[in-house]
């Protein structure tokens, strides 16, 4: 399945049905009175999170979504039928923005969450609604109210417990394939990973979701390489696993390049808990490993863990460190205050990517 994490769509809720002007006409009933029914309400446009989706690719092929109009009122006090709602299905972690791409309308963090993005128009009153003691034969009815229409942006941010970051070719995809059942593309050249990958990791009887993010290079925040657009997928992570290639020229400089790009992203990624690991230790000599470890320790201001995705050396220790941090770190939640009238209230406990 192709990966798409951003899409622009047009939505329109249904118009309300018109009210009806009608009078009761029966034999032997001279003054039957008004009996025009009301129009039906237009359908809503609803966005819902469903299981089994991790891309917005469906919205590349269809960008226009319109709910059904309400039925018109009829005589004999028959009201128009309400229009059918239309439901847009999105993955958990999707954010809805206004057309300006800056105004956040809703942030989906739970499975089965529903949000009414456009309400259908109300149906118009038929003339039976206007009858009174002073107006026994009203000859007017209301038209239905128009529905709402707008362009919106859907932006998906994967929800994972831990995120893999590092320079291209640092061994992130190999590490993910070793610790989970994920099968990312692996090759000996930079930018093998072109879009984020998710894997479920099991360690010491516990499970967590690990996200592999495409590699960052110097100047990524300015659009160099693949840019930093994929960093949004680690905003919700509770911990970052920073892999540094032991075979690179200078492990300390490689570490600082990625940290500078995380800081330039301006979404507090540098404030997240970080575990630093020196990868590919099987490909260097003991002397080189000692030198690279010292460089990385000075740059990261912490003792890096040593790991090899090829031989598996150090992998259990890294996973154990990740699970310990994940169990203690708080779940990232949206800071939007109380739920609006268009959304369902959140559960009392934090959401996890592995919860049902």
Swiss-Prot record:
Q: Which Gene3D superfamilies match?
A: GTP1/OBG domain, P-loop containing nucleotide triphosphate hydrolases
Q: Name one GO biological process term.
A: ribosome biogenesis
Q: Which residues bind GTP?
A: 166-173, 191-195, 212-215, 279-282, 308-310
Write out the entry's keywords from A to Z.
Cytoplasm, GTP-binding, Hydrolase, Magnesium, Metal-binding, Nucleotide-binding
**Keyword Cytoplasm attributed:** yes
| A matching Pfam family | GTP1_OBG
Can you tell me which residues bind Mg(2+)? 173, 193
Map out region (Disordered) in residue numbers.
Answer: 329-356
Stated EC number for the protein is: 3.6.5.-
Question: Where in this chain does the record put each OBG-type G domain?
Answer: 160-327
Record's GO cellular component terms: cytoplasm
**Coiled-coil blocks:** none
* Localization, UniProt: Cytoplasm
| Principal location | cytoplasm
Instruction: Name the family the entry cites.
Output: Belongs to the TRAFAC class OBG-HflX-like GTPase superfamily. OBG GTPase family.
Task: Read off the PANTHER family from this record.
Answer: DEVELOPMENTALLY REGULATED GTP-BINDING PROTEIN-RELATED, MITOCHONDRIAL RIBOSOME-ASSOCIATED GTPASE 2
Q: What is this protein called?
A: GTPase Obg
Identify the gene encoding this protein. obg
